[in-house]
């Protein structure tokens, strides 16, 4: 076997492989003998059919099958010999293939990039310094009360915190437009659900009042035909309701299954908030470390890996919406391409951190991660036992632990400082 390697643009490589004719003919002859021996032919006893007849009937099909098998096998031998690491399946192209002649074919594919980590000392990370304060717990209890609240008719004007039930008809240039009409539409004031100016027109109005407002749809509005358009809405206020909050007492506490009355609920709420806060702090640190790693290391990415990741994201999107990945229409690639590329880049860079630091999943960290995750469930011991009895789940947690260890390795070389945050400030931040 002869092999030549051609480096194309970026990560693309082309192998030209020559396989001696004798190898091909031997493989074809062996397969034809196997057919003659095991297949029945009319007019002949099993195994007694003339080889010329078998070759005439099956020769071309066998030769094609042999060619595919030979190309695959010799490609693997070639990449082992040349110490090449393909990032995806190759595309085979026969160049010369005729009976009695050497087989010459090309294999085109991409390789993994060679990653030489740099700039870890330039990665900047601000470590959040934050705690759950009494006022944070009080605010969370108020949120729980609002979730359990009821609405009651009131002879009041609509304002933030009230709920106005309205009828409305929207028009543009005097013509009603699709989706611009509703009856008995409940609108909780102050939530910003409507386009700018809509709620402002309703504020101060009572049940039975009618009004007309002029507004503009934002340029970034989701409906293409309404972006930036000036519109007019005729509105009737059907009723205005005030929110009635339940008292913070034992009856309220019982709805959440907490023990120890109001103080017990406060303690449970604080515990949950502290657990969520710890995870948010960890995520914030990890996000900054990985962002810095990506910014400092610009690498080529094999398109084959991006293709694979796009497909994974497509399937996850379909499953999130309760669909079947086999029957759902294929979602556009552009919805996922940027995220897919980012995930591939992060995976390659973290893989290099793990390799260069010679990291292995720490058993104690794996246990700690499982216990931390299990603490959010009613019976943590049952969850821990489930993980420990499921090798696939354990492997998933080992990968999580290994990723955390890689982040720790980045932080050890990064510029890390501390920054004070409030609870809500940190919890409401969106990932960069």
Curated annotation (Swiss-Prot):
Name of the protein described by the UniProt record: Trigger factor
Gene Ontology CC annotations of this record: cytoplasm
Enzyme Commission code: 5.2.1.8
InterPro entries linked: PPIase_dom_sf, PPIase_FKBP_dom, Trig_fac, Trigger_fac_C, Trigger_fac_C_sf, Trigger_fac_ribosome-bd_bac, Trigger_fac_ribosome-bd_sf, Trigger_fact/SurA_dom_sf
Occurrences of domain PPIase FKBP-type (ranges): 161-246
Location(s), subcellular: Cytoplasm
Database matches in Pfam families: FKBP_C, Trigger_C, Trigger_N
Protein source organism: Aliivibrio fischeri (strain ATCC 700601 / ES114)
GO biological process, one term: chaperone-mediated protein folding
Catalytic activity, reaction form: [protein]-peptidylproline (omega=180) = [protein]-peptidylproline (omega=0)
Leading EC class: isomerase
Protein encoded by which gene: tig
